[in-house]
Amino acid sequence: PPRSTRKESSAASDVYKRQGQTTGAQNPHTRGGRRAHGPKVAKDWSQKLNSKQKTLARNSAIAATVNPDMVSSRGHNFDESIRFPIIIDSYTESREGSVEKFDVESLPLQNSTRKFVAMMEGLGLGADLNRAKSGRTIRAGKGTMRGRKYRTPKSILLVVANRDGLHKAARNVPGVDVVAAKDLCAEDLAPGGDLGRLTVWTKSAIKAME
């Protein structure tokens, strides 16, 4: 056959060869070939749940967030003077002789992460931020090669009406999640099925859930 035809046939045959062997590597009928009817990765393992059951689970998880004993038993650290539920509206920061007051929902973008951490420390929740930061470990197994290198403990959950501003401020703080009230579910309030997550609410979020 012409030289070009020999090259094309040789390239096509190389696709089915393994290094150092002459048997096909993708044909299920040959030795060393792929599995004929392997498991399908596209299988959907999700299960349907009634809407009333979802609502009941979410409400039960919300009730657990106002119980200091359940929050403490989950491993969270906070000042004993804190009264639950934790609801905030505005925050005043004093720094370098200047006083700044801002709405929590519309946190200024400049130095927003520093302001967010200072706000949590002012509420008496700084110890839990340090717990999540120091508890960050490298995951065992192949997850380190698949974008899941670190395992970070869950820390504060912040429920807001609009998550745009606070989400950007808290996205680099380990263990902190910001969720809009309309998207709140039991998995956010009780990660892993453990009730009593340390939760901070904004007044706007409370109004949005009414």
Q: Which residue stretches match the model-derived regions?
A:
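Long, low-complexity, polar/charged, intrinsically disordered or flexibly structured peripheral segments
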Residues: 17-32
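Single conserved hydrophobic/aromatic residue that forms the stacking wall/gate
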Residues: 1-12, 16
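Extended polybasic, low-complexity segments that bind anionic RNA or targeting/receptor surfaces
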Residues: 28-210
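Generic detector of short alpha-helix boundary/capping microenvironments
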Residues: 1-4, 21, 46, 146
